[in-house]
């Protein structure tokens, strides 16, 4: 959510004690590319459903967030704060509501490839090897090179996105037909994050939502 909302990421943990799982989450270039997207526009809350299973404190809901990305792409976040796994569905007419309500946006009439932004994050074994080599600069550099991880000090996120670097796009998992829907099973207390990419000609991007900040 911090990436979708273009918020700063503040890490209060001791980086010397970072776990492989934490490194795999924090250094995911496909997620960081959303945070550093050249448009710099936050996602907007689209849908909220409180008619879900609550936890012992009576809390629980699901949310759908959506927003524009560089190059005509679209971000979709399916957030599940319910006390169970939830199958979530959102239509293109809803995803592009802020570009035109009631399905009037031209985007709804087009097909979209769906990219999972979590699918290609660093394997835990690789992350642990890198952490273990933190005091061995030669081995550290060798492991980073073998991992072929995106390095923003060499190529900016803007240039990487312009070049359609696959490391920034996530893993293509499906496509949505015109006037179709995005469907995903979202685990309890987690989120699924997707980048939608137009399969045909690009359409002019605009937003009806206002940035209040």
Where are these regions (language model features)?
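C-terminal beta-sandwich/jelly-roll accessory domains of carbohydrate-active enzymes
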Residues: 53-62, 70, 78-213
């Amino acid at each position: 959510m911090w990436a979708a909302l273009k918020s700063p990421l503040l890490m209060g943990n001791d980086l010397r004690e970072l776990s492989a799982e934490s490194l795999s989450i924090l250094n995911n270039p496909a997620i960081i590319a959303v945070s550093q997207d050249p448009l710099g526009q936050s996602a907007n809350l689209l849908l909220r459903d409180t008619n879900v299973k609550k936890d012992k404190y009576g809390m629980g809901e699901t949310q759908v967030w959506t927003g524009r990305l560089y190059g005509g792409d679209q971000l979709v976040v399916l957030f599940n704060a319910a006390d169970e796994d939830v199958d979530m569905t959102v239509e293109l007419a809803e995803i592009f509501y802020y570009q035109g309500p009631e399905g009037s946006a031209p985007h709804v009439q087009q097909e979209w490839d769906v990219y999972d932004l979590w699918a290609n994050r660093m394997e835990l074994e690789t992350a642990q090897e890198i952490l273990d080599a933190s005091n061995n600069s030669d081995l550290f550099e060798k492991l980073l090179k073998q991992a072929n991880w995106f390095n923003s000090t060499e190529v900016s996120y803007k240039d990487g996105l312009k070049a359609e670097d696959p490391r920034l796009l996530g893993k293509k998992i499906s496509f949505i037909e015109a006037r179709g829907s995005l469907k995903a099973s979202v685990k309890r207390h987690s989120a699924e994050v997707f980048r939608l990419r137009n399969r045909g000609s690009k359409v002019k991007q605009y937003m009806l939502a206002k940035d209040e900040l």
